[in-house]
Regions:
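Recognition helix of helix-turn-helix/homeodomain-like DNA-binding domains
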Residues: 32-46
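Short basic helix-loop element that most often maps to the first helix and adjoining turn
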Residues: 11-30, 55
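Short, basic-rich loop-to-helix N-cap that marks the start of a DNA-contacting helix
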Residues: 45-57
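Short, charged recognition helix plus adjacent turn
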Residues: 3, 58, 65-76
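Short, Lys/Arg-enriched anionic-surface-contact patches
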Residues: 1-7
Length: 76
């Protein structure tokens, strides 16, 4: 799955959390973050800290791969 926005990332977090029958409070406690952080993350708030966001994803079993895109002048 290719994610292109913080809203898509948040929707994925929410979907997987619900599939695992976890409340926002459960997930927050498991990740040592506030419930407010989980709420903001699931809403796609762009200012959520990356390290915390990736920790939440990892706790849910979501894995990511990063790929470098070619620069514009390299595509020619």
């Amino acid at each position: 799955m290719k994610l292109s926005s913080s809203k898509e990332f948040g929707a994925l977090i929410k979907k997987v959390r619900k599939q695992q029958v976890l409340t926002q409070i459960d997930l927050a406690n498991a990740c040592s973050v506030s419930t407010g952080f989980i709420i903001d993350l699931e809403k796609g708030k762009a200012s959520c800290e990356l390290d915390k966001s990736l920790n939440v994803a990892a706790m849910l079993g979501i894995r990511f791969e990063a790929h470098e895109q070619p620069k514009i002048n390299e595509q020619e």
